[in-house]
């Protein structure tokens, strides 16, 4: 059965003052120093990695990526561009791949340089200081160059609602996440990698 605390109602819009208060309450600006570029990746330390490794019971691999779209569609208007630089021969073939990573069909990792609030990014840095003419000056994916290994937690919002997938106009709320925790008998911790399942792939297939 669906969790009675989960909701399909559209969350109300926040006022500017409420959004400002929420931003300040959740902000990590200065938490790890003014020059930090890792953000909450700092929470993943050696002890976290040891605890995560101790949880492994099976050698199962769970892929989270999606196939790269090579044809345009409404959900992937900018498909991957493939170009063969050196024709296949007896020994090798070389290609070039151009990716627009922010299509909704493309698996990617957003960094701290991706979003800004009132013209400022992580640690209060102005956008003009973060974004260069061709690349990020700060907060790029290079901040995660050492990788991250931690416990992964799945919150299955669709299963908690007892539906195969959420409709396109439905939202995931705090109540949904808490209901999914109860449904999966898990609790999300500060150093966990969170995976939220809404059934989007299933919905796209069904539609």
Model-derived regions, located:
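Active-/binding-site microenvironments in catalytic and ligand-binding cores
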Residues: 1-207
């Amino acid at each position: 059965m669906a969790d009675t605390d989960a909701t399909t109602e559209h969350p109300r819009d926040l006022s500017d003052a409420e959004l400002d208060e929420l931003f300040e309450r959740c902000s990590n600006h200065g938490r790890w120093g003014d020059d930090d570029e890792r953000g909450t990746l700092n929470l993943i330390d050696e002890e976290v990695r040891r605890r995560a490794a101790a949880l492994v019971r099976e050698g199962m691999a769970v892929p989270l990526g999606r196939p790269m779209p090579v044809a345009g569609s409404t959900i992937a208007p900018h498909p991957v561009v493939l170009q063969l630089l050196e024709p296949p021969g007896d020994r090798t073939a070389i290609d070039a791949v151009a990716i627009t990573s922010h299509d909704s069909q493309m698996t990617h990792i957003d960094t701290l340089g991706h979003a800004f609030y009132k013209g400022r990014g992580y640690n209060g840095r102005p956008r003009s200081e973060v974004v260069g003419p061709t690349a990020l000056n700060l907060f790029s994916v290079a901040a995660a160059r050492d990788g991250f290994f931690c416990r992964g937690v799945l919150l299955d919002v669709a299963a908690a609602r007892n539906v195969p997938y959420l409709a396109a106009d439905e939202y995931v709320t705090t109540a949904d996440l808490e209901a999914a925790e109860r449904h999966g008998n898990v609790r999300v911790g500060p150093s966990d990698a969170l995976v939220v399942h809404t059934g989007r792939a299933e919905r796209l297939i069904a539609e």
